[in-house]
């Protein structure tokens, strides 16, 4: 690994992202595609950029990301978590700011399992009195 390269792993739902940060001009590459190309929805793009905008390093760092599993929303969340961890490795003094915004905490919510005798996790079959 390069000396001036920082790494962070992010997870959300069933997605996992590996994020590499290098000093640069603000390029974001996700699975060999640009941010705008990879995420069609503006909300997903916004989620990915949140930690960088918070610490005002959007134009100073290049990001190289590989992400697997899950859907669009889960992948965006995983990338955000990975960026946050990589930023803390880059500069530990950013931790309190990122913590206050709630980016350091891994969002543990995931899909609830389907139970036997039910149609979904909690949806019961229709009840008939007669």
From Swiss-Prot:
GO terms for cellular component: cytosolic small ribosomal subunit. GO terms for molecular function: RNA binding; structural constituent of ribosome. Keywords: Ribonucleoprotein, Ribosomal protein. It holds the Pfam family Ribosomal_S9. GO terms for biological process: translation. InterPro entries: Ribosomal_Su5_D2-typ_SF, Ribosomal_uS9, Ribosomal_uS9_bac/plastid, Ribosomal_uS9_CS, Ribsml_uS5_D2-typ_fold_subgr. It comes from the Bacteria. Coiled coil: none annotated. Belongs to the universal ribosomal protein uS9 family. This is Small ribosomal subunit protein uS9. It comes from Vibrio campbellii (strain ATCC BAA-1116). The gene is rpsI.
């Amino acid at each position: 690994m390069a000396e001036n390269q920082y790494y962070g792993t992010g997870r959300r739902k069933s997605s996992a992202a590996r994020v590499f940060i290098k000093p640069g001009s603000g390029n974001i590459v996700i699975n060999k595609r640009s941010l705008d190309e990879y995420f069609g929805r503006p909300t997903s793009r916004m989620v990915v950029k949140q930690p960088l905008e918070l610490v005002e390093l959007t134009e100073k760092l290049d990001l190289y990301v590989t992400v697997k599993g899950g859907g669009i929303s889960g992948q965006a969340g995983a990338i955000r978590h990975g960026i946050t961890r990589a930023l803390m490795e880059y500069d530990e003094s950013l931790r309190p700011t990122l913590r206050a915004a709630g980016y350091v905490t891994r969002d543990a919510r995931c899909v609830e399992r389907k139970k036997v005798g039910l149609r979904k996790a909690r949806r019961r079959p229709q009840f008939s009195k007669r």
